[in-house]
UniProtKB/Swiss-Prot annotation:
Known role: May protect the nitrogenase Fe-Mo protein from oxidative damage.
Keywords: Nitrogen fixation
Gene: nifW
Quaternary structure (record): Homotrimer; associates with NifD.
Protein name per Swiss-Prot or TrEMBL: Nitrogenase-stabilizing/protective protein NifW
Pfam families to which the protein is assigned, alphabetical: NifW
Length: 86
């Protein structure tokens, strides 16, 4: 299900929540992420597994998987703070 994600060059080298946010250029507050990195990454993982990127061969964009993963990570981060009221 997540093959598309693991095909993004460099993804297999990410080891921390901060490294994911830096790699995908998603803005975050370090003090907030430090408190909720596990729930954010768990939500991100669920979203990645649920998402099946559509491949439009007419508009082949090499960055499409990276852009999709970036959006899902940002959504996961925002969702954590909406749920916790922070």
């Amino acid at each position: 299900m997540m093959e598309w994600f693991y095909q993004i060059p460099g993804v297999d080298e990410l080891r921390s929540a901060e490294s994911f946010f830096q790699f995908f250029a998603v803005p975050y507050q370090p003090e907030l992420l430090g408190r909720c990195s596990l729930p954010v990454l768990a939500t991100f993982h669920r979203k990645l597994r649920a998402e099946v990127p559509l491949q439009n061969r007419l508009e082949d964009n090499d960055r499409a998987p990276w852009l999709l993963a970036r959006r899902l990570l940002a959504e996961s981060y925002q969702q954590q703070f909406q749920e916790s009221g922070t």
